[in-house]
Amino acid sequence: MLSRTAAPTKASARTLSRAAAEQCRTFATVQDGSANPVRHYGGLKDQDRIFQNLYGRYPPDLKHAKKMGDWHKTKEILLKGHDWIIGEVKASGLRGRGGAGFPSGLKWSFMNFKDWDKDDKPRYLVVNADEGEPGTCKDREIMRKDPHKLVEGCLVAGRAMNATAAYIYIRGEFIQEAAILQNAINEAYADGLIGKNACGSGYDFDVYLHRGAGAYVCGEETSLIESLEGKPGKPRLKPPFPAAVGLFGCPSTVANVETVAVAPTICRRGGNWFAGFGRERNQGTKLFCISGHVNNPCTVEEEMSIPMRELIDKHCGGVRGGWDNLLAVIPGGSSTPILPKHICDTQLMDFDALKDSQSGLGTAALIVMDKSTDVVRAISRLSHFYRHESCGQCTPCREGSKWTEQIMKRFEKGQGREREIDMLQELTKQVEGHTICALGEAFAWPIQGLIRHFRPELEARIRKFAQENGGEALAGGWQRNARQQGKLVSPGM
């Protein structure tokens, strides 16, 4: 694994050695491995937090939203124009909060291509509220507690890309959240904040709410667009990209709920204010969802680059049974590779630091596992989830997810051979990068993380099974007395 130097205090920066930087070059966003990003950590105060009603202290209505600063000087922001808004978002260093981490200002600017104003097609902002990643619940909290942040964010982000309307595609299971968000949209219309002449700015902008039907794959932007158009939720080949041919064949941009919701605050307080938190290329604040074996599971807003251990100890009351009882953490939702305790000890929570550790920030949903966890069974359960949610369009994903689930079920019981571990690793590598959307990587990476860090556990189960059953399991999980038992179908089929 990558070598890290332990820090004497939790406020000091963790730096990679030159050798480790060279080793992780392919995983790092930072191109110069010798240059450590400047870190500005420790300055976040309660009044700096964007989502002031994250814990539901006040009703999620327009009256209380205005008291907490929402819709303040929104007209002035709109009148400054799209170039100014995009400039502030670029200056803030905001990166997509849905998992990919693409620079938001750059992504939004793609909508304002040359001669865009001569194109008579409508233009759309599509908000991805189809939050289905296991362990992730940040967008749900925004829509349930701070819906006006999202509605105002749609208006500001829509102005940045000169959109005519926003479609919020919300997960079908979010019944309460959909009702609260629709009420916030109705309040904004009634107050003249959206619709014709939004906020008195002369800019017309509509917001529509569309409920999905529960498919995880619709969290991918082109699958979401297909579903929004009334088609089966299956991803499109790119190019053309949505900024050119998106929803209903019109220029569109798909953005995450959290990404859109922070835009008005960035414009009000300034991009440089937002960039003052975290470190270079990893700026701003972020919603972290912490679940699993902690004393107080929660969703909390913290600044980027906070140490993982401090995040868990400060907001969750620590790991159940103490930090020494920690086994591993999945740091960014179920699709990111698992990290063992010795890495978590000094791990920073941002895009680059987690790439250096061969994982990812993803949705910043930490799933904490203590030493009572059956880690093989946990990853096997994720394999079942991704097999179930595969849309079946791409052969590597359709077939690969089925086979990885079957192999992981056998590994749970020790019914395998050591060479099958390498075969499983190779199978995931063959799927990775060979599918239309990222679901192929989503089911491959957790297994790769398991093999990378917990291979001895897999081997120990295989040896234990061999000792108890007179030898290793036969290929495919067949038992030696299968014929006598009348079993003619391989396990898992």
UniProtKB/Swiss-Prot annotation:
It is a peripheral membrane protein. It catalyses: a ubiquinone + NADH + 5 H(+)(in) = a ubiquinol + NAD(+) + 4 H(+)(out). Binds 1 FMN. Binds 1 [4Fe-4S] cluster. SMART domains: NADH_4Fe-4S (SM00928). Its cofactor is FMN; [4Fe-4S] cluster. InterPro entries: ComplexI_51kDa_subunit, NADH-UbQ_OxRdtase_51kDa_CS, NADH-UbQ_OxRdtase_suF, Nuo51_FMN-bd, Nuo51_FMN-bd_sf, Nuop51_4Fe4S-bd, Nuop51_4Fe4S-bd_sf, SLBB_dom. Its EC number is 7.1.1.2. NAD(+) binds at residues 96-105. The keyword Glycoprotein does not apply. One of its GO terms (molecular function) is FMN binding. It is found in: Mitochondrion inner membrane. Keywords: 4Fe-4S, Electron transport, Flavoprotein, FMN, Iron, Iron-sulfur, Membrane, Metal-binding, Mitochondrion, Mitochondrion inner membrane, NAD, Oxidoreductase, Respiratory chain, Transit peptide, Translocase, Transport, Ubiquinone. FMN binds at residues 212-259. One of its GO terms (cellular component) is mitochondrial inner membrane. Residues 1-27 form a transit peptide. [4Fe-4S] cluster binds at residues 391, 394, 397, 437. Its main location: mitochondrion. Pfam families: Complex1_51K (PF01512), NADH_4Fe-4S (PF10589), SLBB_2 (PF22461). Complex I is composed of about 40 different subunits. This is a component of the flavoprotein-sulfur (FP) fragment of the enzyme. Belongs to the complex I 51 kDa subunit family. PANTHER family: NADH DEHYDROGENASE [UBIQUINONE] FLAVOPROTEIN 1, MITOCHONDRIAL, NADH-UBIQUINONE OXIDOREDUCTASE FLAVOPROTEIN 1 NDUFV1. Core subunit of the mitochondrial membrane respiratory chain NADH dehydrogenase (Complex I) that is believed to belong to the minimal assembly required for catalysis. Complex I functions in the transfer of electrons from NADH to the respiratory chain. The immediate electron acceptor for the enzyme is believed to be ubiquinone. This is NADH-ubiquinone oxidoreductase 51 kDa subunit, mitochondrial. It comes from Neurospora crassa (strain ATCC 24698 / 74-OR23-1A / CBS 708.71 / DSM 1257 / FGSC 987).
